[in-house]
Amino acid sequence: MNYDYLTDEQKQQLYFHQMQAEQQQHQQQLHYKQQQHIQQQQQHQQNQQNQQQQPQPPRQPFSTFLQNNGSNSDLPQMGTFQQDLQRQNIPNLRFSQQNQPSDLGQEFQDDDSFMDEDLTEIHEQPPMQELNSSPMTHPHSFQQNFQTPTKNDDANLRNQQFQSVDSERSLDFKPPVTFTKLNNNSNADLSSPTESSFLKSNLNLPNSNIPPAGASNDPNAQKSNYIYFNRQPNSLNKIAQDKASSIKLKLENYYQMSVAHAIERNQRRLDLEHKLLNEESGSSEERKNRQLQNLGKKESQFLRLRRTKLSLEDFNTVKVIGKGAFGEVRLVQKRDTGKIYAMKTLLKSEMYKKDQLAHVKAERDVLAGSDSPWVVSLYYSFQDAQYLYLIMEFLPGGDLMTMLIRWQIFTEDITRFYMAECVLAIEAIHKLGFIHRDIKPDNILIDIRGHIKLSDFGLSTGFHKTHDSNYYKKLLEKENPHHTNPQNGNLQAPSMATNNRNSMMVDAIHLTMSNRQQMQTWRKSRRLMAYSTVGTPDYIAPEIFVHQGYGQECDWWSLGAIMFECLIGWPPFCSETPHETYRKILNWQETLQIPDDIHLSPESEDLIRKLLTNAENRLGRYNGADELKSHPFFRGVDWDTIRKVDAPFIPKLRSITDTRFFPTDELENVPDSPALSKAMEQRDQVLQNGGNVKEDLPFIGYTYSRFDYLTRKNAL
């Protein structure tokens, strides 16, 4: 019977009925076995009573037996006969003599012919000599001999005296100290210095803190028979500690990934079954079964392809389309398939120095956990000794900053379109449980159809332990203590500048709100800031600067700042220096002003002011994106089909590698980072020497492969 199309309630009822039937069947079998056992016991007792009632014939001495059989042997020859029996390897002869029932032993205590009777039985049935005969040839004889040991045997065991099979002499056997049982029933005095040192040397327990004899003040206190010791991994060398930490993290990551993959696999199966149940009744059973079989083939294919290891040698670099302080973004083409990707490379050493370990892990988790059309798709991630690599989809339309530089100001209709799509994109990030914290025009990319997608989640957080910098500081305390102490100069202390990735200053621009030409110069300088770690604090919420508690509402502040720039032409808190920008953002009540020569609709101005306000009163704090969707500024927006409509700007490409919407010409004026050049030289040396790629502790588990992309035809 096919149970795939039953409801969960029907499956549960069917499962309960089956369990009840199995329990009833088990009880019947148990009752039958009990009745059979009782009958066997009654039959056995009846047989014993019948044997006791039958009269036993009188026993004859062995000498009479020999005379009746016409034998001339006499009793002194029995010593030789006994030696012959021993040479015939009769097993457990002496033990069988001791293993007689106690009542028979009492009957023949005063009868000298008891030994003769035993030998009579042996003489009547002499043993047959067999090749390779041994006591283990017939194990059932051992079972019969050892099933009912006598009291004498117990006494012998307590005295630790064992009889030899091949000789008549006994051996006094005492177990050595290493056989002493370390449990509650042990009589070993572990407080003894001799036994303590012996156990420590044999059990390899360094620095055991066994309490010495007489250490307790209470004379009536019972001595402990346990070994107490402290783990001291610091006594091991540095290499051993690093290997232990690496193995521990790899094991944790292995089981975490195994459980996560199993949950995802089961969820994909449930989603497909739910989809098939909701289809029209016209779908045939054969078609549904075929789809389930196809899913099984995809799962099997994914397990194989996921083990395929990628490296930098699998891609050809077409052009560098972005640079930053921690790496660069390249347009690459896969050698075997010819497909185009955007490869983001991050330098590991800079991740250490700039305290970006938590940020890069959060970015990878966001991209890997999202299948939303509003987020850039991550296909693969891998690493080598110097770099982390993110293989993402290539969006040829550039970013929103390029559009602002080209068009300067958007109309309200165009602004409404892009802001509505940004609302849906931010909502998708929040549903994943993440906060972006760095939404700006540079991170809003344009796809081939003109719609937006969010990227660059380097400052995002999901409030997981691996997204917290303190987690990596504790992890690296023993590996590189000088990397984790902000006071020694090797790692910059967290500050506004480092948190916003500021490292290269540009010329200050004396800004006047009426000078559009100078504003355009600021935009070009702003692009240079985007390539470096100078960053732009213009879009960051004030609660992030003051290290107060904040939530998802900080992303809505950034959206308000972007909307201000689209309608007016510059950010709301634009200043000559970043520090002046910080000051204006913190004092937003006084510095937020809309120029008099800019005419905005009441709806747009109201939305800007409700987004650029304190966190308690900010729009979207309590009900998220629904509060923004219901604002009058977005009246008429079809939120369900907005991605299907034509965008205001659709990039027209000349080829699949066309990058004219990226300011690649400006990248020639951006100097390469010395750290990047040094890392590339080190990587080339490692490859020439044939060195193995080594995973660092913070980057264990960084590798990723996407299911829906990897299971496509010719994905790899």
From Swiss-Prot:
Region entry Disordered: which residue ranges? 22-78, 128-154, 176-223
Q: Which residues form the Protein kinase domain?
A: 315-634
Q: Which residues cross the membrane?
A: none
Point to the regions of Polar residues compositional bias: 62-78, 130-150, 180-195
Locate the active site.
D438
Query: Which Pfam families does this chain map to?
Result: Pkinase
Family statement: Belongs to the protein kinase superfamily. STE Ser/Thr protein kinase family. COT1 subfamily.
What name goes with this protein?
Serine/threonine-protein kinase CBK1
Its source organism is Debaryomyces hansenii (strain ATCC 36239 / CBS 767 / BCRC 21394 / JCM 1990 / NBRC 0083 / IGC 2968) (Yeast)
Upper taxonomic lineage: Eukaryota, Fungi, Dikarya, Ascomycota, Saccharomycotina
Gene symbol of the encoding locus: CBK1
